[in-house]
Amino acid sequence: MKACGVAATLLALTAPPLFAQEPSVEKAGGYLSAFGGAVWTGGNSTGNAIFEGGVRIAPHMMIFGNIGHFADLQPDLQPSLDAAATALSSAGLGVTGGGTLPAWYGLAGVRAELPASKRAWPYVLGGLGAARLNPTQEFMFTSGTMPDGSMPDVGSDVTAALTSDGSLAAPQSSTALMLTFGGGVELPVVKRWVADVGYRYSRIAADSSLSADPLNTNAMTFGFGYRF
């Protein structure tokens, strides 16, 4: 019995230090994070990368800024591709259109932290900025006659030929207003380092040369951050 009592006493004395060594999310003056993940738009999915940093301005409030990249927001490009194919079809030329729409963006905003415990730090955020849209297009010949009277092989890329003779307008890069809302949770890994899992909704204003409607995206983000 005496041995049991000694063991219990030792356990009680050593337990606090052991628990104190468990990683926890420390309150910090700022953070730097890198994220990757998938973003869904118009029924399609693509990749998303974000580099972000923030500084504290109040006990549970930070301002943040980020730079990100969408790999391909193709659904926003499709209306202009369809319109071009329809116009060429009315002139007796059958083509199928495809393309890509990568976009870089930058945002600044406010992030509110919700300190639920030392083992997790939920947050919500909102930001406003701009997205730089860089469309590319590609049209393949299917039927009919080219403006110069030629008939390429089916499946031939006729984009350059149609652009050079003025039948097709080359897509132009443009900048559009973008806003984001979302949230996530930071989980401690080691001292000052955290894993970050979150969700972000973004809305990119309509570019009349690409689509008449704004583009909405839904992204899941996964990353790591350093709190300083």
Q: PLM ranges: what are they?
A:
Residues S33-G37, S89-V95, L162-A169, A205-D207:
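Extracytoplasmic loops and strand-loop junctions of Gram-negative outer membrane beta-barrel proteins
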Residues Q21-E22, G54-D148, V189, T217, ...:
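Gram-negative (and chloroplast) outer-membrane scaffold detector with strong preference
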Residues Y31, I50, L107-G109, T180-G182, ...:
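Membrane-embedded beta-strand positions in outer-membrane beta-barrel channels/transporters
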Residues Y31-G37, N66-G68, L125-G129, G198-R200:
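Transmembrane beta-strands of outer-membrane beta-barrel proteins
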Residues A38-G47, K118, S208-P214:
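Solvent-exposed loop/turn segments connecting transmembrane beta-strands
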Residues M1-E26:
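Cleavable N-terminal export/targeting peptides
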Residues G43-T46, G98-Y105, A169-M178, P214-N216:
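Short sequence motifs at beta-strands and strand-loop junctions characteristic
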Residues F19-I57, I63, G225-F228:
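Short glycine/proline- and aromatic-enriched beta-strand/turn motifs that initiate or cap beta-hairpins
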